[in-house]
């Protein structure tokens, strides 16, 4: 699966190289966690490579989003807007059902690009527009499907409560998204600590750790990925090889199946695996009867 760079420093290395192309990602966090900054970074990364960008705001107006980007040190956003490479859709204050079912599909149908980055910031007002969960799911699902037709999508979602992803506002977007990223921060005695965690990422190997991150002017979100090191294994560890040698009487087809099954593992995986138990399970899967 083709990967695209996220634009978030340090995130690609813990997300198997980046977002899957034409996928949907939901970034969840409370106010001040850096969600809009994250969305802007994602869009700007594509703009720097000549990709078109669409920023759909469902809450703040265009001027506010641009002002925040310029204050972050990204004044080139103004040039991209003037050149038409970046398109801004201000849907704040609109009737969301009509916007999602009529206006958005019409816009997408007229859009000629096929490798676009789309940011939707935030999804929360859509959920607030109706208390019917079936209607919420239908609206969010339709919106993600339409935007994904022309590119890769990143949405933000406001989180309320203790930050455990248990609120009703998070359930539907988390279910529908291909990738979910959680931003958390704590303020105590004047100090702020922030953590990023990848909750799920379909068809991707990713870190399951909580990674510290910072928000820095000129850079945006900077994720500390040092704790996560994943490299594809270039050799079978000695304990695995010893067990395989003991199984040399197995049919060649099964031996080949076992070897192939091990190819996708990383050096990190072998740290917590018991060699004999692993091999026995793989052999059992490919043995007849």
Q: In which residue ranges do the predicted regions lie?
A:
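P-loop NTPase motor core
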Residues: 25, 98-176, 180
């Amino acid at each position: 699966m083709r990967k695209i760079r996220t634009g978030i420093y340090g995130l690609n290395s813990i997300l198997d190289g980046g977002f899957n192309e034409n996928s949907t990602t939901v970034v969840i966090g409370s106010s001040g966690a850096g969600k809009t900054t994250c969305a802007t970074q994602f869009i700007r990364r594509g703009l720097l490579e000549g990709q078109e960008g669409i920023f759909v705001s469902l809450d703040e107006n265009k001027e506010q989003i641009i002002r925040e980007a310029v204050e972050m040190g990204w004044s080139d956003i103004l040039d991209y807007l003037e050149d038409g490479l970046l398109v801004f859709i201000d849907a704040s204050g609109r009737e969301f059902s009509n916007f999602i079912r009529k206006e958005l599909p019409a816009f997408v149908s007229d859009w000629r690009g096929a490798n676009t980055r789309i940011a939707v910031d935030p999804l929360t007002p859509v959920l607030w527009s109706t208390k019917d969960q079936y209607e919420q799911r239908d609206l969010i699902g339709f919106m993600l499907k339409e935007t994904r037709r022309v590119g890769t999508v990143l949405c933000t979602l406001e989180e309320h409560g203790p930050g455990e992803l248990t609120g009703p506002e998070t359930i539907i977007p988390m279910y529908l998204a291909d990738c979910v990223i959680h931003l958390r921060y704590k303020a105590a005695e004047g100090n702020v600590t922030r953590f990023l965690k990848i909750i799920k990422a379909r068809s991707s190997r990713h870190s399951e750790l909580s990674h510290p991150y910072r928000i820095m002017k000129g850079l945006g979100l900077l994720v500390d990925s040092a704790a996560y090191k994943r490299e594809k294994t270039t050799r079978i560890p000695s304990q695995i090889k010893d067990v395989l040698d003991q199984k040399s009487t197995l049919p060649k087809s099964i031996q080949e199946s076992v070897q192939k099954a091990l190819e996708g593992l990383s050096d990190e995986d072998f740290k917590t695996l018991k060699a004999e138990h692993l091999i026995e399970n793989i052999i059992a899967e490919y043995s007849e009867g």
